[in-house]
Amino acid sequence: IVSTASPDNILLYLPEKQEEQIREIFGGLAERGFPVQNQRPHITVTFAPEMDPHVVELAAELLPAVIPATFRRVGNVIFGTKRKRTVAWLLETSDELEIAARKISAANPEGRGPRWTPHLTMGLRLPREDVGDYLTAMDELTSSHFKELNAVEAAYWRPRTQEKTVLAGG
């Protein structure tokens, strides 16, 4: 179910095999009683309630040169300061993609300036008190060999209209 409040996004998508590996981890977490994660695995470049067309144009200009890209899992990160938290894999990538993503983010009036924290969300809207157990379970369910992720497609995704525009790769 997609909330009508979901923002427009510029996203990076993984190959099917890696998406499947992540969905298997989601399944294992759900079997342990944690909230079901229905989101398609992705890495967000930037988002806005309504994306400025200039930002999409810039992404279409910059991303083809840096996609496909490799990301390394370098740890876990927890977002949020209120009761519900988001747990994600913290990622590192090439300087070239990092620079492009920061330019795209800086061009987004709704963005956070030239900041980008590459991550892949593994748990949305988790109660604060469940985060420790969630991280432990996530580590137990994730193969130690699953260290790299590949971004093979960049797209502009509009949840309200379910429209996906491929900007690079794909």
Locations of the language-model features?
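Basic, often amphipathic N-terminal segments
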Residues: 1-72, 91-150, 163-170
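Short strand-loop-strand
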Residues: 81-84, 119
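A structured binding-face within diverse protein domains that lines the active/interaction site
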Residues: 85, 89
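Glycine-rich beta-strand-turn "strand-cap" elements at beta-sheet edges
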Residues: 77-82, 151-163
